[in-house]
């Protein structure tokens, strides 16, 4: 905004108006008050006065003096040995000299060597001023454009008005000319009539003269009229030309003025941009700069050379006569290449007689310190000499910072540390940590991130994330799967599935002619068993799975390893939940079903109802047009067993089951356990190839050489072919049930893959735990008070431990939660007892026992150890213990109703109600609700209960009493008191 008075100008200069008035008075500008107007001439006079008074010269315009102050601390001990901190202040004064361009061109000026050190704040201020000036120039350009458009519109309107006035004037002149012509014609006619009415004496001569007279009288009128028309047309044309010329001149002047203003604005904008560019370059260059003083040089002939000799602020001018290479006198061998050096290559050399400019010095300081000279010049350091001549070339190139961000394709593995992720993106680790903090996670530089989180961070930082292929040794396992061995028919693997207590194991007992079911705890199967049976029709391998709901994972593993599923359904019980689950497992695996309707020997057996229920579940018998054979059997009498086996073998023939025999074995871990004498033991179902004793096997993260191999009867065996279950010993640890078993060529390769899998499992587990920390924290904040029941679960086999842990975790509620501190396979050891002591946990042993040392330690520390053989009992006991941890439920029981008959006001006590107990009884310790018009207005406790003048504990129905209520005196006759007691009721899950 332009300053029109002294006050506004003082506000622009950010100085008091009184000081400005004094300066104006000193400059000879008389202003009495702050409201006096101020012209541009007054400002110019003030500026000249200030320049003269402060001694401003042209030299000051070319010289800038900057002062920098730096404060530091040093610690020094005095004579007594006491340390003191001393403040040290260093003041640096640097002068920046701009060389005169004209004198540089003429070669008669030389600038002194100066050091320029520009403060960062000063540079930012300059850049801000340049940007502000550019914005002002842009705003002025817009205002000028708008003003020019307005002037053009006004000029067009004015020309339109002038043209309309000219047309109106012409029309008026034409009408006046017509009137004058008509008047002249009338006058001529009257004159002719007058001459015709004269005496007839001169008839002949007059008649002879009449025509000439009339012609003479008419000729001047016509001539005058034509002359007037010509003059009028000429005047109109002249006026038109004059108006057009004026309009053209006005338009040309306006265009020239606008062009001049635009050129001025463009020049100012270019100057502002150049200044901003110079400031940015100064900010990007090193702080200390030495400007080389140029030597006098003759005026160059070519413009390009003139521009080169002129020099800039950042690069001193090189004299035209000086060669860009080193002097030939000192380096003859380098003279020839220097002579043929192109100007572009010469520009890279140092512009001085053997000593580089400030840019080269800064580049040397930034670069890596080497023992040899890489500058290609004279100064070769201590290695310089004839032997090292010409070996090094100039390799100091100025690094150009990329102007656009580089988008990288980052391959993210399954787990990666923060430091590695930052290295892949070529950013600092602090940037990655900052992005993680924005996402709500606190991480360290060595923390593992899972793949999903890492890919989110990569995308947040503007790069492209790609899930990397695992660089693991398992890829070689897949490559070596191709085998040239001949595939031969193999026995079918049949899994027996169904609901608990439907007779699965009893059916297998009859087929095996063994008594397995009688030896199982509680009469239910809690392990997955594998048996192969030789029948007259061929060999069949059976897998017996548990039917209890807790063993879902076991049933899923059984369906995965099987070829045919026998679905056992009790004829007297029908389709149950685990029956439906077994059907779902079989359908998910694409395994054919053979339905065995068991217990047909019972009186209440109803096979038809079972068929209808199975049809509703999608299992249609063959007699109804389906593809599932239904066989009615009895595991007790053996009825229908032969038909069942025949249907199973028929299904196997249809499937044409084959597997290579002479090949390395591959299989599946059916069950695994930790035996105290044998170590880790795994039950394996061989699916292809032949497993021999002494082979090196890999099962998940466990590996080892097969030291012993037993069949399902416990007898040693040397080899096992396809579809044969065996029990092997010699693994490094207990493998997870369901893992794939592969025979490896050597133990070194097996160890490498196993260790890789262990590390990957650990990294993935840690990364997932870290990702879930924040969610768990927020969840716990919203939970409030939650009770935890810590448990340590030890089981005989892996599958049972897994099933028991899952069943116990399902008991958790919002108030009480099961916390599995540790779960493993094997007996209860001292380390388990120590862990239970530290975590205050209860140890649950499922088909396992504690050794003597563990029992003594548990008794000494008061650790509770519970033994179970049936999964029902373990789940029920934990459920009962959790019920005891629940907070009791509070219930209100109404004991009586009281009616207020009269109210007494007792000093220092308040209102006392004379009441009649109309229902139930009233106790001194009861709580009471005050009802008025059947609306509760107060709930509180009794303060006193009296009968006559005696305090009583209880008043029953039909008796009168006096009552007062704590903190309530607003008692009115007719109120009712509802007396109640609060009782606590134990809750259960």
UniProtKB/Swiss-Prot annotation:
Residues annotated to bind GTP: 498-505, 544-548, 598-601
Residue span of region G4: 598-601
InterPro entries to which the protein is assigned, alphabetical: DNA-bd_dom_put_sf, EF-G-like_DII, IF2_assoc_dom_bac, IF2_II, IF2_N, P-loop_NTPase, Small_GTP-bd, T_Tr_GTP-bd_dom
Superkingdom of the source species: Bacteria
Ranges of biased composition (kind: Basic and acidic residues): 40-60, 122-178, 231-280
Subcellular location: Cytoplasm
Keywords on record: Cytoplasm, GTP-binding, Initiation factor, Nucleotide-binding, Protein biosynthesis
One Gene Ontology cellular component: cytosol
Region (G1): 498-505
Gly residues bias locations: 374-387
Region feature (G5): 634-636
Region (G2): 523-527
One of the record's GO molecular function terms: GTP binding
Compositional bias of kind Low complexity: 182-223, 318-345
Family per similarity comment: Belongs to the TRAFAC class translation factor GTPase superfamily. Classic translation factor GTPase family. IF-2 subfamily.
Protein name: Translation initiation factor IF-2
Species annotation: Paraburkholderia xenovorans (strain LB400)
């Amino acid at each position: 905004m332009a300053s029109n008075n002294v006050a506004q100008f003082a506000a622009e200069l950010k100085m008091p108006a009184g000081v400005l008035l004094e300066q104006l008075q000193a400059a000879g500008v008389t202003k009495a008050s702050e409201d006096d107007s101020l012209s541009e001439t007054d400002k110019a006079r003030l500026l000249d006065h200030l320049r003269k008074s402060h001694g401003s010269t042209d030299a000051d315009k070319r010289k800038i003096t900057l002062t920098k102050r730096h404060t530091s601390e040093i610690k020094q001990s005095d004579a007594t040995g006491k340390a003191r901190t001393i403040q040290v202040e260093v003041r640096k004064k640097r002068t920046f000299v701009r060389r005169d361009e004209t004198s540089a061109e003429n070669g008669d000026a030389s600038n002194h060597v100066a050091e320029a050190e520009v403060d960062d704040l000063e540079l930012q201020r300059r850049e801000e001023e340049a940007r502000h000036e550019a914005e002002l120039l842009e705003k002025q350009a817009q205002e000028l454009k708008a003003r020019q458009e307005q002037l053009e519109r006004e000029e067009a309107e004015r020309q339109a008005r002038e043209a309309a006035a000219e047309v109106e004037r012409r029309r008026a002149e034409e009408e006046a000319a017509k009137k004058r012509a008509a008047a002249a014609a009338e006058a001529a006619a009257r004159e002719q009539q007058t001459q015709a009415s004269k005496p007839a004496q001169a008839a002949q001569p007059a008649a002879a003269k009449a025509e000439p007279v009339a012609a003479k009288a008419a000729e001047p009128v016509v001539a005058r009229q034509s002359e007037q028309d010509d003059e009028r047309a000429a005047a109109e044309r002249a006026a038109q030309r004059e108006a057009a010329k004026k309009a053209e001149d006005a338009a040309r002047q306006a265009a020239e003025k606008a062009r001049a203003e635009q050129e001025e604005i463009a020049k100012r904008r270019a100057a502002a941009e150049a200044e901003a560019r110079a400031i940015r370059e100064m900010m990007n260059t090193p702080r200390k700069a030495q400007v080389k003083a140029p030597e006098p040089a003759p005026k160059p002939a070519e413009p390009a050379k003139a521009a080169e000799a002129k020099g800039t602020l950042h690069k001193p001018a090189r004299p035209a006569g000086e060669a860009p290479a080193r002097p030939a006198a000192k380096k003859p061998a380098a003279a020839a290449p220097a002579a043929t050096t192109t100007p572009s290559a010469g520009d890279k050399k140092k512009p001085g007689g053997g000593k580089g400019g400030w840019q080269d010095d800064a580049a040397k300081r930034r670069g890596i310190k080497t023992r040899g000279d890489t500058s290609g010049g004279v100064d070769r350091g201590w290695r310089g000499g004839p032997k090292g001549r010409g070996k090094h070339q100039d390799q100091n190139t100025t690094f150009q910072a990329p102007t656009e961000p580089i988008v990288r394709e980052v391959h993210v593995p399954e787990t990666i540390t923060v430091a590695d992720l930052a290295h892949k993106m070529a950013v600092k680790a602090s940037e990655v940590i900052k992005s993680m903090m924005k996402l709500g996670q606190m991480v360290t530089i060595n923390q593992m991130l899972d793949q999903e989180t890492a890919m989110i961070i990569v995308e947040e930082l503007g790069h492209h994330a790609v899930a990397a292929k695992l660089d693991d040794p398992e890829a070689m396992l897949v490559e070596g799967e191709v085998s040239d061995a001949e595939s031969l028919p193999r026995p079918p693997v049949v899994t027996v599935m169904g609901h608990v207590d439907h007779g699965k194991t009893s059916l297998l007992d009859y087929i095996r002619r063994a008594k397995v079911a009688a030896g199982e705890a509680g009469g239910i199967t809690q392990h997955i068993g594998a048996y192969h049976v030789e029948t007259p029709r061929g060999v069949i391998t059976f897998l017996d799975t548990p039917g209890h709901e807790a063993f879902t994972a076991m049933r899923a593993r059984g369906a995965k390893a099987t070829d045919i599923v026998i679905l056992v359904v009790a004829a007297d019980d029908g389709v149950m939940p685990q029956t439906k689950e077994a059907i779902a497992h079989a359908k998910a695996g694409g395994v054919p079903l053979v339905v065995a309707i068991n217990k047909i020997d019972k009186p209440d057996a109803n096979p038809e109802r079972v068929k209808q229920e199975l049809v509703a579940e999608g299992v249609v018998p063959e007699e109804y047009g389906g593809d599932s054979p239904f066989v009615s059997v009895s595991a007790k009498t053996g009825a229908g067993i032969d038909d069942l086996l025949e249907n199973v073998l028929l299904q196997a023939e249809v499937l044409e089951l084959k597997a290579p025999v002479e090949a390395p074995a591959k299989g599946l871990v059916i069950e695994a356990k930790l035996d105290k004498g044998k170590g880790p033991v795994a039950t394996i179902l061989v699916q292809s190839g032949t497993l021999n004793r002494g082979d090196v096997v890999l099962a998940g993260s466990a590996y080892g050489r097969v030291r012993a191999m037993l069949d399902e009867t416990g007898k040693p065996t040397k080899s096992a072919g396809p579809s044969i279950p065996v029990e092997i010993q010699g693994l490094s640890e207990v493998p997870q049930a369901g893992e794939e078993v592969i025979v490896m060529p050597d133990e070194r390769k097996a160890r490498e893959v196993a260790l890789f899998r262990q590390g990957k499992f650990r990294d993935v587990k840690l990364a997932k735990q870290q990702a879930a920390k924040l969610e768990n924290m927020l969840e716990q904040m919203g939970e409030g008070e939650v009770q935890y029941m810590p448990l340590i679960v030890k089981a005989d086999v892996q599958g049972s431990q897994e099933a028991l842990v899952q069943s116990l975790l399902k008991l958790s509620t919002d108030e009480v939660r099961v916390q599995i501190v540790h779960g493993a396979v094997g007996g209860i050891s001292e380390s388990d007892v120590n862990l239970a002591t530290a975590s205050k946990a209860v140890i649950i042993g499922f088909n396992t026992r504690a050794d003597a040392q563990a029992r003594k330690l548990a008794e000494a520390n008061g650790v509770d150890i519970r033994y179970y053989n049936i999964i029902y009992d373990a789940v029920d006991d934990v459920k009962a213990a959790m019920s005891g941890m629940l907070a009791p439920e509070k219930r209100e029981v109404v004991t009586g109703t009281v009616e207020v008959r009269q109210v007494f006001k007792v000093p220092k006590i308040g209102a006392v109600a004379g009441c009649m107990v109309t229902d139930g009884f009233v106790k001194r310790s009861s709580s009471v609700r005050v009802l008025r018009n059947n609306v509760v207005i107060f709930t509180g406790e009794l303060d006193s209960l009296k009968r006559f003048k005696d305090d009583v504990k209880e008043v029953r129905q039909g008796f009168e009493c006096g009552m007062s209520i704590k903190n309530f005196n607003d008692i009115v006759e007719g109120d009712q008191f509802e007396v109640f007691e609060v009782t606590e009721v134990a809750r259960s899950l």
